[in-house]
């Protein structure tokens, strides 16, 4: 994938960049793997706003992704590499030998016509899925399960990857993209390789309207609100915060305040905390 630049024909185009979509092989998704996706605009079942900055955007359909990779021993051929509006990574359509079709996250280097496998007999090749106990130390992986059989939950975004660092009893040490080193059960599955579309982070949206096409609404500063809307609101002119530290709209400390639950049950699985930004 390469980044496409535009001539500054308008102010919105001046710094705008996009993907050239060179890896995409079709624009028509597999109909049997599509599901309707209703827009919620950040509202819950009572119609109350629970997530800010959501609303509008282009109409989408959900692509059913196989995060479990449990078609053991059945070869699958990569039919297409496709764009997915619901995630930063591209997806690959897999045609299995028994006739079933599934979408998976497209790994970097995965090509149309390539054959992939799942299970203990699979080779250590890009796109193959195995249990962590069967993956050699030093291997780069993605789409990692946290509970056996639940499906991949970690390392699914464009360009991300994790590395197998070692094995200790029934656990495997994994270094995640953030730098955190974590113990994960050896019977959990992961897919070999790095997630593709790695230049996604270099894309410059360029103008506010393009954010709106993606369903993102504006973020308003608390300092320009009224005091009944935000702890930073009110005052005459450009007033200071008036508190010891910045606050969230709900009165909780923010910008550096630790929100992780103390004595979290999963603390025992974290060997080293993530890198500080």
Swiss-Prot record:
Gene Ontology MF: a single term: rRNA binding
Location of region: Disordered: 24-55, 221-277
SMART domains: Ribosomal_L2, Ribosomal_L2_C
An annotated GO BP: cytoplasmic translation
Keywords of the record: Ribonucleoprotein, Ribosomal protein, RNA-binding, rRNA-binding
Any one GO cellular component localisation term in the record: large ribosomal subunit
Superkingdom of this protein's organism: Bacteria
Alphabetical list of InterPro entries matching this protein: NA-bd_OB-fold (IPR012340), Rib_uL2_dom2 (IPR014722), Ribosomal_uL2 (IPR002171), Ribosomal_uL2_bac/org-type (IPR005880), Ribosomal_uL2_C (IPR022669), Ribosomal_uL2_CS (IPR022671), Ribosomal_uL2_dom3 (IPR014726), Ribosomal_uL2_RNA-bd_dom (IPR022666)
Function: One of the primary rRNA binding proteins. Required for association of the 30S and 50S subunits to form the 70S ribosome, for tRNA binding and peptide bond formation. It has been suggested to have peptidyltransferase activity; this is somewhat controversial. Makes several contacts with the 16S rRNA in the 70S ribosome.
Quaternary structure and partners: Part of the 50S ribosomal subunit. Forms a bridge to the 30S subunit in the 70S ribosome.
NCBIfam families per UniProt: rplB_bact (TIGR01171)
Family: Belongs to the universal ribosomal protein uL2 family.
PANTHER family in the record: LARGE RIBOSOMAL SUBUNIT PROTEIN UL2M, RIBOSOMAL PROTEIN L2
Designated name of the protein: Large ribosomal subunit protein uL2
């Amino acid at each position: 994938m390469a980044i496409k630049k535009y001539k500054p024909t308008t102010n919105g185009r001046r710094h705008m960049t996009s993907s050239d979509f060179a890896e995409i092989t079709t624009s028509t998704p597999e109909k049997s793997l599509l599901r309707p996706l209703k827009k919620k605009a950040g509202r819950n079942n009572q119609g109350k706003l629970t997530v800010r900055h959501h609303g509008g955007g282009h109409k989408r359909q959900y692509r059913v992704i196989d995060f479990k990779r449990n078609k053991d021993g059945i070869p699958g051929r990569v039919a297409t590499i496709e764009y997915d509006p619901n995630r930063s990574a591209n997806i690959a359509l897999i045609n299995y030998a028994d006739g079933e079709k599934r979408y998976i996250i497209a790994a970097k280097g995965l090509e149309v016509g390539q054959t992939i496998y799942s299970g203990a007999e699979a080779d250590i090749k890009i796109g193959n899925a195995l249990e962590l106990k069967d993956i050699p130390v030093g291997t780069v992986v993605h789409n990692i399960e946290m509970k056996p059989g639940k499906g991949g939950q970690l390392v699914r975004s464009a360009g991300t990857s994790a590395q197998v660092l070692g094995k200790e009893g029934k656990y495997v040490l994994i270094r995640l993209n953030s730098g955190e080193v974590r113990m994960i059960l050896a019977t959990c599955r992961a897919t070999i390789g790095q997630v593709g579309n790695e230049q996604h982070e270099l894309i410059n949206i360029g103008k506010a309207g393009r954010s709106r096409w993606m369903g993102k609404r504006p973020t308003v500063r608390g300092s320009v609100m009224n005091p009944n809307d935000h702890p930073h609101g009110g005052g005459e002119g450009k007033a200071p915060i008036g508190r010891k530290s910045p606050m969230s709209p709900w009165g909780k400390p923010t910008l550096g305040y630790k929100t992780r639950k103390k004595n979290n049950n999963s603390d025992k699985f974290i060997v080293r905390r993530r890198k500080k930004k």
